[in-house]
């Protein structure tokens, strides 16, 4: 049974509930996930399926992947990814119909990259005084002590690269499933920018 799928983040909109209230939702387009290989605990040490998704020209596919698609007699796919803990058969297609309204899902993707940022933007630090000649408007302040401990502790929040990391938002509600358009509407925002690849997994699976 398919409990997870790869999708593409499209845009945010709003949906109206039965009581007339509007809630913000993110529309995820589920391109058909074709199972190209099955991993078993006996042979591979874990249970998983490899799926291919995303349209691509045949000339853009390397030879090993082209051989896989030719053997399965399916059009080339841009991405080959694994879904752990999911069972299936080679050639099976996983789509939006694996979910239904009311399900709770975890959505994982890479967050938007923000580049090198300071502590105010990266960690939400409060700023310093902006008047009376202060030069410490957005400075992080003291980061260590003097003679003891005479070092900076590990984990100290400091300026650095922000974003572009794997983020999972848990327990989002599936508001609507449109099997004809291969769309899943989930309540709230999900990581990543427009057209980002996201993994949707049922909560508790």
UniProtKB/Swiss-Prot annotation:
One of its GO terms (cellular component) is cytosolic large ribosomal subunit. Keywords: Ribonucleoprotein, Ribosomal protein, RNA-binding, rRNA-binding. The keyword Cell cycle does not apply. GO terms for molecular function: rRNA binding; structural constituent of ribosome. InterPro entries: Ribosomal_uL3, Ribosomal_uL3_bac/org-type, Transl_B-barrel_sf. It comes from the Bacteria. Signal peptide: none annotated. Residues 128-150 are annotated as: Disordered. GO terms for biological process: translation. It holds the Pfam family Ribosomal_L3. Disulfide bonds: none annotated. The keyword Ribonucleoprotein applies. Belongs to the universal ribosomal protein uL3 family. One of the primary rRNA binding proteins, it binds directly near the 3'-end of the 23S rRNA, where it nucleates assembly of the 50S subunit. Part of the 50S ribosomal subunit. Forms a cluster with proteins L14 and L19. This is Large ribosomal subunit protein uL3.
């Amino acid at each position: 049974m398919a409990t997870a799928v790869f999708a593409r983040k499209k845009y945010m909109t709003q949906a109206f509930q039965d009581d007339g209230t509007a809630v913000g939702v993110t529309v995820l387009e589920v391109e058909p996930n074709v199972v190209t290989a099955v991993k078993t605990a006996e042979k591979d040490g874990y249970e998983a399926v490899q799926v291919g998704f995303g349209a691509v020209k045949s000339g853009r596919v390397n030879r090993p992947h082209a051989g896989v698609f030719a053997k399965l007699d399916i059009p080339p796919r841009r991405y080959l990814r694994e879904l752990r803990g999911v069972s299936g058969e080679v050639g099976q297609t996983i789509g939006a119909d694996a979910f239904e309204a009311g399900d709770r899902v975890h959505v994982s993707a890479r967050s938007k990259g923000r580049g090198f940022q300071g502590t105010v933007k990266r960690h939400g630090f409060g700023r310093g005084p902006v008047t009376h000649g202060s030069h410490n408007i957005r400075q992080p302040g003291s980061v260590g002590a003097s003679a003891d401990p005479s070092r900076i502790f590990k984990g100290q929040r400091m300026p650095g690269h922000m974003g572009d990391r794997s983020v999972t938002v848990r327990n989002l509600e599936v508001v609507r499933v449109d099997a004809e358009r291969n769309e899943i509407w989930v309540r709230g925002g999900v990581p990543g920018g427009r057209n980002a690849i996201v993994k949707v997994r049922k909560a508790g699976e």
